Amino acid sequence: MALPCTSMSLVRCREHLLSLQLRCRGLRQRIVQADPETTIACWCTPSDLEDPQKPALLLIHGFGGSSTWQWGKQIKSLRKHFRLFLPDLVFFGKSFTVSQHRSEIFQAEMIASAMEAMGIKSYNVLGISYGGFVAFRLAHIFQERVEKVVIVSSGICMSPRDMEELLARGNVKKVPELFVPETHAAVKDLLRLSFVKPPPLLCSFIIDDVIQNMYGTHRKELKELLEALQKREDEEALPTLPQKVLIIWGDQDGVFPLNLAHQLKKHLGENANLAVIEHASHAVHLEKPVEFTEIVLKFFLHDGV
């Protein structure tokens, strides 16, 4: 039998280890038919092993890989209090569609459909970065299903000027060049903007591995997701949300600066609170996992910040 880490891909080896970690935490991956054209892969606890009285919590990842990559430091603490659902967004991990829809609204609709197919009628939601855009739309469209919302490091209120400044910080001309990197320089710039202390300088073969195995499979479609997101921001007025919302941000976010968190809070009004974590950047849940998780639990369990 072939090993899961063949062809000397450190990315694939790491992904395999992270999958084992999730399994050790009691999660299993399901493939759910969201609609006739779309399948959603989702890590969750088997229903026969979980207390049905626990509230459900949906965790929506960003562009830094599938759900397998992003929540390892939160699972142990969150699983004590929630039935967890970690879906892969469409074109990430094992989720796929033949549909031509690319908007964050489509992503939200597919996640909602997958949750319904799994028998989950109501849930809390937490989304980070691109996942925060999806969580926002999910909470707006499916208000009767979504209870509380946490949005992390998501530039939902970006203006054209904010976009220009992001491109300048990332040394790119278009957004997909930064978030779907194809060059060594782009990978390094993305890490620089995402972490206060970026990982040590990577060897060339590791960067090549990241480019190929984290972004190579659906590169065209991933770029289209970002283009659709940017187009919708330019065309539509942003709705508000009726749910209680917690906004979490790193004070040194290099992707979406802290002023965007304050703008989002102002837009959402009295329903929203903001928690700023010091000495953290865009990947705040990875840089400050203990503080981040404590804030999340306090909000979901006690309405605190």
Language model features with spans:
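Flexible "cap/lid" loop of the alpha/beta hydrolase fold
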Residues: 136-141, 145-182
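Conserved acidic catalytic loop of the alpha/beta-hydrolase fold
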Residues: 105-123
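Short alpha-helix in the alpha/beta-hydrolase fold that links the catalytic acid
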Residues: 243, 257-266
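Short beta-strand/loop motif that positions the catalytic acidic residue
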Residues: 241-242, 247-249, 253
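Conserved HGGG/HGGXW glycine-rich cap/lid loop of the alpha/beta-hydrolase fold
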Residues: 44-96
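Conserved alpha/beta-hydrolase catalytic His-Asp/Glu region
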Residues: 160-168, 178-242
